[in-house]
From Swiss-Prot:
Its EC number is 6.1.1.20. GO terms for cellular component: cytoplasm. The gene is pheS. This is Phenylalanine--tRNA ligase alpha subunit. Belongs to the class-II aminoacyl-tRNA synthetase family. Phe-tRNA synthetase alpha subunit type 1 subfamily. PANTHER family: PHENYLALANINE--TRNA LIGASE, MITOCHONDRIAL, PHENYLALANYL-TRNA SYNTHETASE. It comes from Rhodopseudomonas palustris (strain BisB5). It is found in: Cytoplasm. GO terms for molecular function: ATP binding; magnesium ion binding; phenylalanine-tRNA ligase activity; tRNA binding.
Length: 360
């Protein structure tokens, strides 16, 4: 083995043995620096005859290239190892909020929490989420839903209307989320299985009513849908939402223009000491309305009622939030009181899931 080969082998061994970047830099200077061993060999080329310079120069440059590549590879390896060691030493994940912060921290509003709880429950049953605009047409909000002209819900004291257009038509703030069901039936063919959460508006304000409130409605359209399916869905929802093992429900005849038959649903509960406990007791509490979709509604939305049938239900998100979490006044939900929110709000990581617990 020639002296050049011995030198190259020794330098490569020193590179491999370098334990940090400082040691590696010392090897680089010793080999390729101004007074380095390979630099010294390159300086001797000027004293050689042309033929020898050609041969020796090629060999020295090959050795220099091998050393340079080894230095680069070792430097990258040492940098990666240093970064891994630094990351391993830094145990704080700055991307996550603290569960018990030292400073005051914001809270998730109970309405947002309940909205997520509803979504988690119905998503587990295979429902998609459908959304629509708050500003609606009279056609979608009333006419296609079998509200005849002169129905009380069309009166000014119930509905927020915009100024009439030149053609006499008027837009309005939707009074329920049922227009989303209309838009869904107009835009897609059965089978349909959706929930429609959102803001709704009616001209009313007291301890249990606000001009703007939140609803969630559900819609199922298929060839074999019947009331038995509806009762099962509502029972499973109530058990999951109120986090009880069993729930008794009472279905009472009622009237809604868009369903036939129409039903109101009560849930068994026990009242006492300022609390409501579900799944036990001898009291009953109304929680929602439901029924089979009226054939006139199906026809108005382009669905043949001789082939398909379906059911729908609706409930106030604000109301069921108050029932579950013991809030007395609906208006407090919208007053932006930080003290109230600190009491009833949720921590940022309290994400509802059926596996982990909705309100844990």
């Amino acid at each position: 083995m020639s002296n050049l080969e011995n030198l190259q082998t020794q330098i490569l061994a020193d590179i491999a043995a370098s334990s940090d970047e400082a040691a590696l830099e010392a090897v680089r200077v010793g080999a390729l620096g101004k007074k380095g061993s390979i630099s010294a060999l390159l300086a001797t080329l000027g004293k050689m005859d042309p033929e020898q310079r050609k041969t020796e120069g090629a060999a020295i440059n090959l050795a220099k290239e091998a050393v340079t590549q080894a230095l680069t590879a070792r430097r990258d390896l040492l940098k990666a190892a240093a970064l891994d060691a630094k990351l391993a030493a830094e145990t704080i994940d700055v991307t996550l909020p603290l569960r018990e912060p030292l400073a005051e921290q914001g809270r998730i509003h109970p309405l947002s929490q309940v909205w997520d709880e509803l979504t988690a429950i119905f998503a587990d049953m295979g429902f998609a989420i459908a959304e629509g605009p708050d500003i609606e047409t009279d056609d979608n909000n009333f006419t296609r839903l079998n509200f005849p002209e002169g129905h009380p819900a069309r009166e000014m004291h119930d509905t927020f209307y915009f100024n009439p257009k030149e053609d006499g038509s008027r837009l309005l703030l939707r009074t329920h989320t049922s227009p989303v069901q209309v838009r869904t039936m107009l835009s897609q063919r059965p089978p349909i299985r959706v929930i429609c959460p959102g803001r709704t508006y009616r001209s009313d304000s007291d301890q249990t009513h606000t001009p703007m409130f939140h609803q969630v409605e559900g819609l199922v359209i298929d060839k074999g849908s019947h009331l038995g399916h509806l009762k099962w869905i509502l029972a499973e929802f109530c058990k999951a939402f109120f986090e009880v093992d069993n729930v008794n429900m009472r279905f009472r005849p009622s009237f809604f223009p868009f369903t036939e038959p129409s039903l109101e649903v009560d849930i068994q509960c026990r009242r006492g000491n300022g609390e409501i406990r579900f799944g036990e007791g001898e009291d009953w509490l109304e929680i929602l309305g439901c029924g089979m979709v009226h054939p006139n509604v199906l026809t108005a939305c382009g669905i043949d009622p001789e082939v398909y049938q379906g059911f729908a239900w609706g409930m106030g998100i604000d109301r069921i939030a108050m029932l579950k979490y013991g809030m007395a006044d609906l208006r407090q939900l919208f007053e932006a009181d930080s003290r109230w929110l600190n009491h009833y709000g949720f921590k940022p990581l309290d994400i509802p899931s059926l596996a982990g617990g909705l309100s844990s």
